[in-house]
């Protein structure tokens, strides 16, 4: 909506490209032989949760920006003015949508032929794992809160800026706790989104 393009088409395209970038393969262990086999055509549930959060955000940004660029360059199917607006919007999204899907598909094929194997592995190794290590530590939490207040002192909404980067990390850590709890194990993370909501952000940033 900010870019004055079809928000519904852009949102749907973000979902489609995320699924396209996700490898539809799951490892299955045969109970009788304990042998692990790769099953094709199955949605990996793990990548639909915290593991796929960063990938979903990055793919959504890429697909939206690419869609916006193509639409604003008028690379679309133009319909006569007598055609209803809903039909016009549908046809206008066809060419940009096809181009975006093709770009993401080619990107996936290229990455699958590297040592990484998938976009999820790249994001996990380069971005998510380092941020998770930082975000899960006490010093990381302290630095994040201090940075929030430094930004506020400059007249910038610090919670929004820092939260935009770190919230996916803390939500991911919270989801790891959920998985461990459901499995009857000790929860591994103290610093999570709930930790900030209960002990730091009550009444405002820094317990104001």
Regions found by a protein language model. Give the residues of each.
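Pore-lining transmembrane helices
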Residues: 1-70, 76, 91-208
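Cytosolic juxtamembrane amphipathic/interface segments immediately preceding
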Residues: 79-89
């Amino acid at each position: 909506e900010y870019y004055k393009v079809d928000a519904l088409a852009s949102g749907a395209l973000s979902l489609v490209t995320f699924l396209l970038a996700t490898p539809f393969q799951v490892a299955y262990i045969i109970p009788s032989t304990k042998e692990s086999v790769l099953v094709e055509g199955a949605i990996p549930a793990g990548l639909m949760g915290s593991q796929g959060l960063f990938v979903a955000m990055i793919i959504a940004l890429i697909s939206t920006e690419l869609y916006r660029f193509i639409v604003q360059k008028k690379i679309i199917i133009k319909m006569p003015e007598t055609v209803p607006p809903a039909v016009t919007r549908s046809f206008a999204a066809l060419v940009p949508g096809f181009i975006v899907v093709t770009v993401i598909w080619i990107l996936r094929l290229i990455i699958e032929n590297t040592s990484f194997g998938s976009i999820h592995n790249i994001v996990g190794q380069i971005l998510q794992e380092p941020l998770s290590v930082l975000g899960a530590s006490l010093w990381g939490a302290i630095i994040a809160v201090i940075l929030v207040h430094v930004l506020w002192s400059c007249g910038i909404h610090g919670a929004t800026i820092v939260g935009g980067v770190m919230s996916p990390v803390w939500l991911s850590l919270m989801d790891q706790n959920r998985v461990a709890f459901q499995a009857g194990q000790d929860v591994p993370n103290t610093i999570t989104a709930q930790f900030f909501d209960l002990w730091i952000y009550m009444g405002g940033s820094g317990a104001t």
